Amino acid sequence: MSKLFISTTNVGRAHEADIFGLSISTPYTVTCSGDGWIKLWKNRLLEGDLPKNNVISKFVHRTGVHHVDAFHSVEHGGVELDLVACVTFSGELVIYSVNMKQLAVEQVDLFSSSDKQKSYWCVKWFKSSDSEIPHKLLATDVKGSTRVWNLTVSHTEDADSRLQLILHGEITAPVANFATSCDMSPKGLIATGFENGSVIVSQADTLRPVYNFEGFGIRGTEESGRTVRDVKFSPMGELLAVANDSGSYGCVTLYETEYGERIGNLTVPTHSSQASIGSFAHNGWVFAVSFNSTGEFLATCGYDSKVRVWDVKMRERLSTLSLSAGDIEIEEDILLEDEFGDSLKNPPVFGVSFVEKGVRGGTGSDTNEGLCCICLDRSIRWYREAGGI
């Protein structure tokens, strides 16, 4: 079995500096960059529309922005929420409200004074499908704690006053360690990944840890660590995918969440002499993982300039996209070298996300899923699965 993805559109030099974050909501593909801007790229493009002519840009902070997550929901009474949370290199956590009719992005002040004193790193929204469970916002700080807020929505005429973030509590790391990533499952579990290679899974209601997973790749030395780059729960919350370093390689490990047992690793053949004692998903660090809407497939991306799609049940690779600077459609937007003169002919991939059916415009988007990725050549690429049109 294999899956074929074809390019639908792309944009080179999408930002003036490296693109570090990617998030897909129904209206927009959202990116953030070291240039200090977040950009909201319209998803439903008509034939002939160019992405750069259909983007909303918002300057956040001069130090740059490294994490971003978008939230879109239609609440009871038809109240539509479109929020973007991002974290700057100064450690500030910022939330914006998007007015889709006016194409305006405005900052909303939802944090208490104690919230603002923290220095944050990763941010993640959780969209609840249960009316009894509030939407949540998660954010890790540089000391390893994960703060959890409940998002409440009241029905008022003033769009800003109807939103409230109420601190639910904080998950404190057993030892101080940099918390690199976080996610929440619909089964009420929160996963936090750490620089030392561990992942702590906690209950969202009590904030108490229930599992502690360790990396299963080759143990890194002090010079080549085992940092966890990303954690993602499957849509039903039954699985947890963990991407971590193993020296200069990238590992992806799957765990089931009911009993906290390791299922196995996603593996491709490698020419490394250490292959017999390690299981590698990429020949470079894995920066991001993304489940599709059914949880059947997992997309991964890495420093090896590749995006891979895997069958989760069989743990088999179904597709590999090898990215090249020449993929970019507009020649003057191709970036062949970085500011240090290093080649970007085959750019590392910093982020990847599945795109649900019906989100993107164009032929086949209503019947086929897609992919979106961001690369070190400051580009954004969109794909859709071939066939079924």
Stretches with model-predicted labels:
Residues 32-35, 87-90, 140-143, 193-196, ...:
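Conserved strand-to-loop turn within each blade of WD40 beta-propeller repeats
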Residues 1-16, 52-53, 165:
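A short helix->beta-strand "capping" segment at the edge of beta-propeller domains
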Residues 351-389:
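Blade-level signature of beta-propeller repeat domains, shared across WD40, Kelch, NHL, RCC1
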Residues 44-46, 98-101, 152-154, 204-207, ...:
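Short loop/turn segments that connect beta-strands within beta-propeller blades
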Residues 38-42, 93-97, 146-150, 199-203, ...:
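WD40-repeat beta-propellers
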Residues 16-23, 62-75, 116-128, 174-183, ...:
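Canonical WD40 repeat/beta-propeller blade segments in eukaryotic WD-repeat proteins
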Residues 26, 74, 79-81, 129-134, ...:
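Conserved loop/turn motif of beta-propeller repeat scaffolds
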